Every structure is written in C-alpha cells, then in structure tokens.
Amino acid sequence: MINTHITLPGLDLKNPVMPASGTFGFGDVPAAKKFDLNDLGAMVIKTTTPKATSGNPQPQIAVLDDGVLNSVGLTNPGVDQVISEKLVPLRKQYPNLPIMASVGGDSESDYVEVAKKLSDSDLVNALEINVSCPNVAQGGMSFGVHPDVVEELTKKIKDVVDVPIYVKLTPNVTDIVAIAQAAEKGGADGISMINTVLGMDIDVQTRRPVLGHNVGGLSGEAVKPIAIRMISQVYQNVTLPIIGMGGISSAEDVIKFMLAGASAVAVGTAHFNDSIASKHIADSLPAELEKLGIDDINDLVGQVKFN
C-alpha cells in the first residue's frame, strides 16, 4: 500500500493535493458538486477581506497559449459573510475536511481583523496569508516585496490567531529567499508559493491590453519552471514546510514539486481545462508513485539530485 498521507501544521492530509485559493470559490463552485471534496487533501477558500469587494474591471481573464492571465481581484462578500454564509455550510457538509482560509487586506489592521475572525470561528484549520495584496500605506506596493513588512505582518497575525499560518509568497521580487526567511522569523508555520507572475498581453487590433486592469497575474504551464526553481531555493534556506503551486496539471508535476521541496501542492489553472483537475491528479498519484517505485510520498520531499 502506497502512503500518500502528509502531516503539516494544522493540516492532516490524506494526500498532498488541494485547490489553489480562488480556483474553487468557497467550495461552492459547480465543479465542487461533481465529487466528494474529501477525496482531496484539503480545501483552500478564496481570499477574504474585511468588507465586500467587487474585483477589477472586465475583462478579468485572458487565456494564453501556455497559461492564463487574470486580474479578477479579491471578489468576496467580506469576512463576516464568508464565515456565516460560506464556511458554516462548508464545514457542516465536510466536518473532517482540512480547510485553509486565505487572508487579504489593504492594511496590516485589515489582515489582523480577518485572520482573528477566521481563527475565532473555529471553522478553519489553518490560514494562508496572501501578501500579494497592495499595501495602501506604502503607496500600493505589494506587502510581499519587503522582508521587514512580511516579518512584522506575520508577527501581528500570529499574536491574534490560534491556528497555523502559511505565508503565500509573491514571485515578483528580487530575492524570494529573503522574503521566506522574513516569514519564518515572524513566526510563520509554513510557506505557500508561488503566487502569480505579473504580466501583460496586448490585442494588436485595438492596441489595448487584453485585461481591463491592463496588467494581471500569469499562471499555468508557463510559470512552472519558475515555481520549481523558487521552491527549491526556499527549501534549501528555511525550515518551514512548503505548499507548492504554479502550473501543476498532473501527478508527475506533483512529484516534481515535491522533489524541489514542497510537502504538499495546490492546483489552480489546470481547472480551466478540467473542472475537477485536482481530484483527477489526486486519484492518479498512487499509480504514478508505484511506477517510480516510491512507497511513501514523504520520501520525495527535497530529494532532487543536483548536477
């Protein structure tokens, strides 16, 4: 019997596969009704903010040859409604499923408020801190690009929550290791990486960017080598477990990410082509491991053999 069980802070996973935040809503998208979410390792919900947000101007999504460019924004009904209208029914339907909530905001106080409310709800097992949000107090620069800001934000959140926190790193930085180390220093229990890579595409007929917001986050196949490289770098320089993401679309990809240093993975853009990709990947993982002669998936973590 092949072991796919993974134990992470706050998350007891039957397998390492979960949907990436924003790609499965609050467990209420049509695809989530096509299978039992207990078939996944965990459920990660859409980023939640203090008040309701409506997202960015249309068009918000552009499908490219090798990925997806999106500027959806953090559309959500606000933390109080997320708890009462989304998390309560999700937890009622899935009492034993590990649930990770994603936290966002425009200020440190926003993050602290949302994190505390979600932690106090007793409905989630862990929090993912989305530090790619623009920091209004710093002129709109992402929270996640300054190590000192990440460290301070992590500390403030840790002070008010009772569940483990995973800091989600943006790849749009010069030195991602410094950001990961800052999260570790601030008391993070884990790292989640990578978020989308900033990009833009242009319609040559109109000469306008294809997204209403002009720029957006690139995800999918195109970012996979970037994600693998960054995960490997961070794994070698911090002691925290890593949830890896960035272009995963197969069980073989899961193995690649784990060899680079991820202990678990999140599937996002693959759901555009296959609405239940995360389930299909989780289901096919044991056979892929057997093909490679691997009895315990935990033995893969960080075991890439460098040339």
UniProtKB/Swiss-Prot annotation:
<dbReference type="GO" id="GO:0044205">
    <property type="term" value="P:'de novo' UMP biosynthetic process"/>
</dbReference>
<dbReference type="InterPro" id="IPR033888">
    <property type="entry name" value="DHOD_1B"/>
</dbReference>
<dbReference type="InterPro" id="IPR012135">
    <property type="entry name" value="Dihydroorotate_DH_1_2"/>
</dbReference>
<keyword id="KW-0963">Cytoplasm</keyword>
<keyword id="KW-0665">Pyrimidine biosynthesis</keyword>
<keyword id="KW-0288">FMN</keyword>
<feature type="binding site">
    <location>
        <position position="46"/>
    </location>
    <ligand>
        <name>substrate</name>
    </ligand>
</feature>
<dbReference type="InterPro" id="IPR005720">
    <property type="entry name" value="Dihydroorotate_DH_cat"/>
</dbReference>
<feature type="active site" description="Nucleophile">
    <location>
        <position position="133"/>
    </location>
</feature>
<feature type="binding site">
    <location>
        <position position="130"/>
    </location>
    <ligand>
        <name>FMN</name>
    </ligand>
</feature>
<feature type="binding site">
    <location>
        <begin position="195"/>
        <end position="196"/>
    </location>
    <ligand>
        <name>substrate</name>
    </ligand>
</feature>
<dbReference type="GO" id="GO:0006207">
    <property type="term" value="P:'de novo' pyrimidine nucleobase biosynthetic process"/>
</dbReference>
<feature type="binding site">
    <location>
        <begin position="70"/>
        <end position="74"/>
    </location>
    <ligand>
        <name>substrate</name>
    </ligand>
</feature>
<dbReference type="InterPro" id="IPR013785">
    <property type="entry name" value="Aldolase_TIM"/>
</dbReference>
<feature type="binding site">
    <location>
        <position position="130"/>
    </location>
    <ligand>
        <name>substrate</name>
    </ligand>
</feature>
<protein>
    <recommendedName>
        <fullName>Dihydroorotate dehydrogenase A (fumarate)</fullName>
        <ecNumber>1.3.98.1</ecNumber>
    </recommendedName>
</protein>
<feature type="binding site">
    <location>
        <begin position="246"/>
        <end position="247"/>
    </location>
    <ligand>
        <name>FMN</name>
    </ligand>
</feature>
<comment type="function">
    <text>Catalyzes the conversion of dihydroorotate to orotate with fumarate as the electron acceptor.</text>
</comment>
<dbReference type="GO" id="GO:0005737">
    <property type="term" value="C:cytoplasm"/>
</dbReference>
<dbReference type="GO" id="GO:1990663">
    <property type="term" value="F:dihydroorotate dehydrogenase (fumarate) activity"/>
</dbReference>
<dbReference type="InterPro" id="IPR050074">
    <property type="entry name" value="DHO_dehydrogenase"/>
</dbReference>
<comment type="pathway">
    <text>Pyrimidine metabolism; UMP biosynthesis via de novo pathway.</text>
</comment>
<feature type="binding site">
    <location>
        <begin position="46"/>
        <end position="47"/>
    </location>
    <ligand>
        <name>FMN</name>
    </ligand>
</feature>
<feature type="binding site">
    <location>
        <begin position="268"/>
        <end position="269"/>
    </location>
    <ligand>
        <name>FMN</name>
    </ligand>
</feature>
<comment type="similarity">
    <text>Belongs to the dihydroorotate dehydrogenase family. Type 1 subfamily.</text>
</comment>
<dbReference type="Pfam" id="PF01180">
    <property type="entry name" value="DHO_dh"/>
</dbReference>
<keyword id="KW-0285">Flavoprotein</keyword>
<dbReference type="InterPro" id="IPR049622">
    <property type="entry name" value="Dihydroorotate_DH_I"/>
</dbReference>
<keyword id="KW-0560">Oxidoreductase</keyword>
<dbReference type="InterPro" id="IPR024920">
    <property type="entry name" value="Dihydroorotate_DH_1"/>
</dbReference>
<dbReference type="InterPro" id="IPR001295">
    <property type="entry name" value="Dihydroorotate_DH_CS"/>
</dbReference>
<feature type="binding site">
    <location>
        <position position="220"/>
    </location>
    <ligand>
        <name>FMN</name>
    </ligand>
</feature>
<feature type="binding site">
    <location>
        <position position="194"/>
    </location>
    <ligand>
        <name>FMN</name>
    </ligand>
</feature>
<feature type="binding site">
    <location>
        <position position="21"/>
    </location>
    <ligand>
        <name>FMN</name>
    </ligand>
</feature>
<feature type="binding site">
    <location>
        <position position="168"/>
    </location>
    <ligand>
        <name>FMN</name>
    </ligand>
</feature>
<comment type="subunit">
    <text>Homodimer.</text>
</comment>
